[in-house]
Amino acid sequence: GVSMANFMKMAVNEQRKYRGEEPLKASEFLRMMREKSAIVELDSKLTSRAVNEGFSGGEKKKNEIFQMAMLDPKLAVLDETDSGLDIDALRIVATGVTKLHTKQNATIVITHYQRLLDYIVPDVVHVLYKGRIIYSGDKTLAQKLEREGYDWLINDYKE
């Protein structure tokens, strides 16, 4: 398979090409990889392995945030990024997401558990039901849902 380093170099340089920028020199790319992998405490040995081959669940999640750091998207959608993570990996991944947040980008984090929000403070919390946003609020909404569940919202929802 393709190594993480080669995959990321190709992705980063294609993105730079699209923006009319020169490809990164090898030394610049390696420096960038070291800086970005430090954000999620990604073991440098993983970058020489094939993409996600033999990665643990936590390593895959860290790798997703590492890729996000390398590509610096304007919009990132993280679907249950907390799924299957132990508390240490959850903290590392969430801290990485928080460090990458700027005024120039947006991250949509989909989760069913409030514990992720102990580390990522959302600007807004939306509750989706049957494909629609039925309720919005701040972090306190997530805390209430953790305590009381969703029934109180769904019972009040009229299609």
Which stretches of residues belong to each language-model region?
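Conserved beta-strand-loop-alpha-helix hinge in the C-terminal portion
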Residues: 119, 124, 128, 132-155
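ABC-family P-loop ATPase nucleotide-binding domains
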Residues: 1-74
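Hydrophobic residue in the Walker B motif beta-strand
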Residues: 76-78
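Helical "lid/switch" subdomain of P-loop NTPase nucleotide-binding domains
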Residues: 89, 113-116, 120-121
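Conserved H-loop
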Residues: 104-112
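Conserved D-loop-proximal element of ABC-family nucleotide-binding domains
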Residues: 86-91, 136
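Walker B catalytic motif
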Residues: 80-81, 88
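Helical segment within the ABC ATPase nucleotide-binding domain
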Residues: 90-103
